[in-house]
């Protein structure tokens, strides 16, 4: 890590304290308010400089997308339906210490699974799904997809302007999306599952 200025050290210390106290890093606005910056953009510039110096990593597309090397872990974000879609909650509940090198491509965050629609491939209710942030998916990949304001975990298939989000449980029906009538956004690709607290 390259030498940091006193202000950069202060920002880094604030981020560490915030994670220790609240379980998640501060937003750009919270950093700006703490230091009396004129806008969150000023905080963003400091964060980008800290990232270039290797002091932290920025995760694009998340208001609290700041990761400290060797600390902070992966954010557990909201809950994702693995059955009927539920309203997406972009709330960071906590952080989990995980070696991101275990996943390829690298995991950007964890999403809590609710439901049993993917149980036949080992994605169970209560699991933490490791997700690589991506706006694109290939046929056959397991994706986190958003339809309107709701999210679901399913296997992705596309033919023409029709997308099928396929469950891995015969008790559930596929979700069929006509892209001419409905908006579908790929939020990420599933790259692994973390299960804890269950006896074998």
From Swiss-Prot:
Please name the catalytic residues of this protein. Answer: 117 (for autocatalytic cleavage activity), 154 (for autocatalytic cleavage activity)
Q: Which domain of life is it from?
A: Bacteria
Question: Which Gene Ontology terms describe the biological processes this protein takes part in?
Answer: DNA repair; DNA replication; negative regulation of DNA-templated transcription; proteolysis; SOS response
Whether Cell cycle counts among this entry's keywords is no
Which residues does the annotation list for site: Cleavage? 82-83
Q: Where is the signal peptide?
A: none
Q: Which family does it belong to?
A: Belongs to the peptidase S24 family.
PANTHER family named in the record? LEXA REPRESSOR, LEXA REPRESSOR-RELATED
Q: What name goes with this protein?
A: LexA repressor
Species, as recorded: Thiobacillus denitrificans (strain ATCC 25259 / T1)
What gene is it encoded by?
Answer: lexA
